[in-house]
Amino acid sequence: MKLLKIIIIIFLALTIEINADTEKEIINNLQKGGNLIFIRHAYAPGNGDPENFDINNCETQRNLSQSGRLQSKKIGNFFKENDIPIKLVISSEWCRCKETALIAFKNYETENFLNSFYSAKFAKNRKMQMKKLKDLSLIHI
């Protein structure tokens, strides 16, 4: 439940105006550390990937737009400007996710268990993903 709240808070903090007291409270909680923050990826126009995409070839995938790159920079700046500790950044193998992580946080690792189960091609990963995410939250928080 804490993870879901943090995801929603980060999303709201980056996308809508909120009153100053609420924003300070959010930032204060994030500055304490010990949070698992999930960011899918910045803006990549469209939906899904082409049927014949290759996880190892960015040219076959839906990628960040210039707006998405700017959004990634803003995400990174939010964390830097507010001294929010980052212990570890992990990305899926999708190019749009890796690019978001690179622009926002510079250093990141990839893990295939974070790969989307959006398409039928990867739907079998869902149970494993949920288990590994739970394990990850227990280890790193």
Language model feature labels by segment:
Residues 129-135:
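A well-ordered secondary-structure block
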Residues 139-141:
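Conserved small/polar residues in nucleotide/adenosyl-binding loops
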Residues 4-14:
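Sec-dependent N-terminal signal peptides
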Residues 21-121, 130:
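Active-site-proximal alpha-helix that buttresses catalytic centers in soluble enzyme cores
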Residues 16-20:
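Sec/Tat signal peptide C-region and signal peptidase I cleavage site
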